[in-house]
Design a protein with these regions (language model features):
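Residue-level marker of alpha-helix boundaries and capping positions
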Residues: 2-3, 65
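Structured C-terminal cap/extension of enzyme domains
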Residues: 10-114
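Structural preference for beta-strand elements that scaffold enzyme active sites
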Residues: 3-5, 21-22
Length: 114
């Protein structure tokens, strides 16, 4: 037997629907309760409600993680949410100003910033 975990937030629900057993999540760093809510619904077999969470989390993941190589966007998001410092070590570099603005908008759209 082999256990399959999703390593891509956008594939958590699709993978779980074909037998995947969990997720190594990036967005759970900033919205752990939301990822847990979705995975709990998956485990309960309520794929209709899980799909609602998936769509919301998918937008967050897609809009955030396409800005730069991971973990730069999640680290920047966590810094914006006062969860950590914005200090990076090479080879990571800060987000460009336009991408930082896009990230702030993504976090605002999700309801994490006002």
């Amino acid at each position: 037997d082999i256990t399959i975990l999703s390593g891509d937030d956008s594939l958590t629900l699709p993978l779980a629907s074909v037998g995947g057993k969990g997720v190594i999540s990036v967005v759970a760093n900033i919205v752990p309760a939301d990822v847990k809510a979705m995975t709990d619904l998956i485990l309960e077999g309520d794929l209709v409600k899980a799909r609602q969470w998936h769509r919301k989390l998918f937008a967050l993941s897609k809009n955030m993680l396409t800005l730069a190589t991971n973990p730069i966007p999640i680290k920047a998001a966590m810094a914006m949410l006062d969860m950590c410092s914005d200090e990076l070590r090479l080879p990571m570099t800060p987000l460009e100003p336009a991408k930082k603005t896009a990230l702030k908008q993504t976090l605002t759209d999700y309801g994490l910033l006002s």
